[in-house]
Regions:
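Strongly charged
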Residues: 1-131
């Protein structure tokens, strides 16, 4: 008997990630659209990293308009971490633009959990999800 979560995860739409853009590629992209050089932009990004670390180590969140908020966290072992909360405007722009990447199981976008489980049960009759 398959679990409901296994079936849903098997068929859920997933982005097939391309190569991650690094600082150099970001700097080249931004420099082509501004009067700054790639070196200037990398310097600013390095300074931004230092500034976020500084304020987070002081227990302060950092809000970067258009990107999101970086909030320091701590767990029971005393390990520090940073949570990123995506800016609402950026999320809205992502969802209102046309996505050019590849999506695995794209045909399942908009299907209900019941429809996905029915699909699983039809394709896996020997390992059904039971309600």
């Amino acid at each position: 008997m398959a679990s409901r979560i296994s079936a849903l995860n098997h068929y859920r739409p997933q982005i097939e990630y391309g190569e991650t853009a690094d600082w150099r590629e970001m700097a080249d992209y931004m420099a082509a659209r501004s009067t700054l050089s790639p070196s200037d932009i990398i310097g600013v990004l390095t300074g931004l990293e230092d500034a976020v670390l500084h304020f987070n180590l002081s227990g302060r969140g950092v809000k970067l308009e258009g990107l999101g908020t970086y909030l320091p966290n701590i767990n029971y072992r005393g390990e520090l971490d940073v949570a990123h909360r995506l800016d609402r405007r950026l999320k809205r722009q992502l969802n209102n633009s046309s996505f050019n990447g590849r999506i695995r199981n794209k045909k399942n976008i908009g299907k209900s959990a019941a429809e996905v489980i029915a699909l699983w049960n039809a394709e896996h009759p020997d390992d059904p999800v039971l309600y």
